[in-house]
Each structure stands twice: as structure tokens, then as C-alpha cells.
Amino acid sequence: EHTILVALVGQEILRGKQIREGGVSTDDWLHFIISLVCHDIGYVKGVCRMDRDREHLYATGNGEEMVELSPGASDASLTPYHVDRGKLFIEERFGKNRIIDAEIIKRNVELTRFPVPKEEDHQDTRYFPGLVRAADLIGQLSDPRYLKKIGALFYEFEETGQNKYLNYRHPDDLKHNYPKFYWNVVHPYIQDGLRYLS
């Protein structure tokens, strides 16, 4: 459901960019849409060629490194690895394709890493990688059922230890912190995307 919302938002961002500025080529469109559809594919167990489901071993996306998950662990347990796993999936599926440039898609997906790294190359908000991130964030936070999903999100955070990092003790902490999270963390990265949506 999240990927569908992100793809819909991203398509409208691209449409707005084309209307306002022009210059969005068919190749740009193709790579952008594939990036949107694949941005969270790294959460899916078994999607990378090295994954060994029966042994609960999964590629991290960093070389030959594998991570062992406990039986019954949810896909959220792959959160620390999902961007690198997604880039590995893209390389495995599109690396030899003559039409699709896997490097463009991997760069777009890299900018969906969250929390956003402080490095300069992750600060883009205007170009396609930054707009993929904007679509990801807008798609998630504009989900009409987002507030109802906060409980499940909290338990995903708990499974990965992210709740302690964020200092959330229970699901209501997420709900009460939502405005601060939006304005301080999300808004700086979506302003250009919002401009194309208006």
C-alpha cells in the first residue's frame, strides 16, 4: 500500500515538474517510476539472490555480508539494511539491462535512506533523487490511515530498537510527536516536491 501511495505521489511530482519546467525525458520518467516502485523492495525477504529463507539468512547489500534473523521476525527487522538490499536487488535485476540504467535507480533509492544522513550528497531536494525521497515521505505522511497505523509503526520501531533511539515508550509518543517530526525532520526535504504538486 505504501509503495502505491509513493508511486502515485511521485508521478504527480514528475507531472508538476514537467508542467512547470519541462525537460523531463522519457528516460527520466522510466527511471523515476522504477525507483519509486523499488524504493522499499529491500524489506522483502527472499528478494536478493543470496537470501536463504530456510536458514533465516539475508543479504545486507554490503558485499557478501549476511544477517541472521530470528524465526518469526517481521520484514521490519530488515530496516537497517533495506536501502542497501534494495540497491542490490536493482543491480541484480537491472544491472545488465541495455535500456535501464541501474546506477540512476540506485542513486534515487539511496536518497530514501532515513534518517537522512548529514553528508552533502544526501541533502538534494531539487533533482530526481531528492524528489524520489520527497515522494516517499509525502506518500507515507499523506496516507489517510497514517494515524491508525502508528501502533504498528511503533512495534516495528520496537523490533529494530529504533523506539529507544527516538525515545518513544509507547505508540502515543509517535502520535504526540507527529507535528514536531513533520516540521523539523520531514518538511525540509519535501518543499520542492510540494511545489511541483501545487
Regions found by a protein language model. Name each.
Residues 1-8, 67-76:
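Active-site flanking loop/helix segments enriched in acidic
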Residues 2, 39, 82:
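Histidine-centered active-site/metal-ligand motif
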Residues 3-6, 20-21, 48, 55-57:
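A glycine-rich, hydrophobic loop/mini-helix early in the fold
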Residues 6-13, 79-96:
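An active-site-proximal "capping" alpha-helix that borders the catalytic cofactor pocket
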Residues 12-28, 38, 42-49, 92-99, ...:
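Divalent metal-dependent phosphate-bond-processing catalytic cores, especially two-metal-ion Mg2+/Mn2+ enzymes
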Residues 31-35:
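Active-site alpha-helix of zinc metalloproteases
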Residues 47-72:
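Post-HEXXH active-site segment of zinc metalloproteases
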Residues 86, 104-108:
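A cyclin-like helical interaction fold
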